[in-house]
A protein has these predicted regions:
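Bacterial N-terminal signal peptides
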Residues: 9-20, 450
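N-terminal, active-site-proximal structural segment of metallo-dependent hydrolase catalytic domains
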Residues: 27-157, 187-204, 219-223, 236-238, ...
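A substrate-binding/cap region within the structured catalytic cores of diverse enzymes
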Residues: 143-185
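Metal-dependent phosphoester-hydrolase catalytic domains
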Residues: 167-171, 216, 244-250, 255-282, ...
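Active-site His/acidic residue clusters
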Residues: 226-245
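C-terminal low-complexity, Ser/Thr- and acidic/Pro-rich disordered "stalk" regions positioned immediately N-terminal
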Residues: 405-434
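A cross-kingdom C-terminal cell-surface attachment/processing module
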Residues: 438-461
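Cytoplasmic C-terminal tails of single-pass
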Residues: 462-466
Length: 466
């Protein structure tokens, strides 16, 4: 049973006086939206230089960086969070160790957070291709893997959830071939021939890690968490192989939510994308700023200006202050620095960028949204800091959302890759969040109780404040 809210409890005495004439809770009309759901994404930089190192670091509870990551998450207390750059290994032992040794342990007064459910899966980073993908004459470098990486699983990701993951309905697109996307931006050489041979393209996956659709059951309403981490649009040449791959990786989700995905085939052979009435939230580090950085033109706009997507436009005061203090490339940026989510080199470039996103479907009510980026005079600045960073060069991005409620309840489907653990106190796991958070650093955008964030202001605000 869900706990009573403060508002409900305050009404009980009056309700009891008129019990004979008042409708019972069972007779009351259900809300048209879900309760407030706090959803977050965080590139936590929990990647390591060799396989097994992350597992070793998490075996004990004294790793400083992992403690900072956990405290950052505890300060926001999201119901669902995607963590990018969390090295993957097949038995998910690191996922469990981070939960038990860090998330469920208090840090500097922050309350422990319990996630009974989690998902992690294999990725293309570090998987040897056997081909010279970067044209340097070698076939064994990290750039010759299907996704840049020194070993299979490096730069993977994990999703933690307070709600059940419908594991038998998870869809992944790790092995979908880039060439099979209609109109794919395949790179070419200066003479117009393909950068990659037909032999390479017949094995080349579009996703540099994986793209995964995780249906999560939120009290009978299914929310599709669409998680990915496209390749950075940098470290290439005139052929723009990484820029173009980044563009098409972003396009995959744009097509998936817009009824343009008939060509898409998942790793189990099922075709197509989401139905028009599906609830979803796109999460991840997409390595693409709408106006600055190295992106192929229009890359992230495929999502930000999509009629199917709401830009929650999270902000922070810390991002604005750091752009001013760090100067350099930031002084010529066009994106409002309040939207920045990554703190990168400023001399000469690229400067701080907006590259991490929480993007729900149209019809979702946005209560608040923010970037966890404290200012330097805030005690919590120790969690973000300056280079070399104590935690990550990315900032956690969060949004408090009310999704349209489904008419047909759905049932959870636990499996071996979806684990349930008791809370630290031994009580039943808390699977809901009131959404009442205080003390979150930064400026949060609120649109009022029950207000719908209008799509028409997405790009207007970005450009008018640039």
């Amino acid at each position: 049973m869900k706990p009573l809210t403060i508002a409900t409890a305050a009404c009980l005495p009056l309700a009891l006086c008129f019990l004979s004439s008042a409708p019972t809770l069972a007779e009351s009309a259900p809300s048209s939206t879900t309760d407030v759901l706090t959803v977050a994404t965080f590139n936590a930089s929990l990647n390591r230089e060799a396989p097994g190192q992350l597992l070793d670091d998490l075996t004990t509870a004294d790793n400083a960086q992992a403690s900072n990551v956990a405290e950052t998450i505890q300060r926001v207390d999201p119901d669902i969070i995607l963590i990018n750059e969390f090295d993957y290994e097949a038995n998910a032992a690191a996922v469990d160790l981070f939960r038990t040794n860090y998330l469920e342990v208090p840090h500097n007064g922050a309350q422990p957070v319990s996630y009974p459910y989690s998902w992690s899966g294999s990725v293309n980073t570090g998987v040897p291709s056997g081909y010279d993908l970067d044209g340097d004459g070698s076939t064994t470098g990290p750039s010759d893997a299907w996704g840049f990486g020194k070993f299979p699983g490096q730069y993977g990701f994990v999703v933690y959830s307070k709600y059940p993951i419908k594991n038998d309905q998870v869809r992944s697109f790790q092995h979908f071939l880039w060439k099979d996307m209609p109109g794919a931006l395949l790179p070419t050489k200066s003479d117009g021939t393909g950068w990659y041979s037909d032999e390479v393209l017949n094995a080349f996956p579009l996703s540099s890690k994986t793209h995964v659709d995780l249906p999560i059951d939120v009290d009978g309403t299914t929310i599709h968490v669409l998680a990915a981490h496209p390749t950075p649009p940098s470290f290439d040449g005139a052929e723009q192989r990484n820029k173009k791959r980044n563009f098409d990786e972003i396009r995959l989700w744009a097509d998936y939510v817009a009824n343009r995905a008939d060509y898409l085939c998942d790793d189990n052979g099922a075709k197509g994308g989401l139905t028009e009435d599906a609830n979803f939230v796109i999460l991840g580090d997409y390595n693409s700023d709408p106006l600055d950085g190295d992106s192929y033109p229009g890359a992230i706009d495929q999502l930000l200006t999509s009629p199917q997507v709401v830009d929650t436009a999270p902000t922070s005061l810390g991002g604005t202050r750091e752009a001013e203090l760090q100067g350099g490339a930031n002084l010529t940026h066009r994106t409002n620095p309040a939207y920045d989510t990554g703190d990168f080199g400023d001399n000469p470039r690229p400067g701080n960028l907006r590259i991490d996103y929480v993007l729900p479907n149209v019809g979702t009510q946005v209560e608040e949204a923010g970037v966890f980026w404290p200012t330097r005079d805030d005690e919590l600045f120790r969690l973000t800091g300056l280079a070399p960073f104590p935690t990550s060069d990315h900032r956690l991005v969060w949004s408090k959302l009310r999704f349209p409620r489904s008419l047909t309840p759905s049932e959870p489907n636990p499996s071996t890759s979806q684990r349930e653990t008791p809370s630290p106190s031994g009580e039943e796991p808390r699977l809901a969040n009131s959404g009442a958070h205080s003390g979150l650093p930064g400026v949060a955008i609120g649109v009022g109780a029950g207000g719908v964030l209008l799509l028409t202001r997405q790009r207007a605000r970005l450009r008018s404040q640039a």
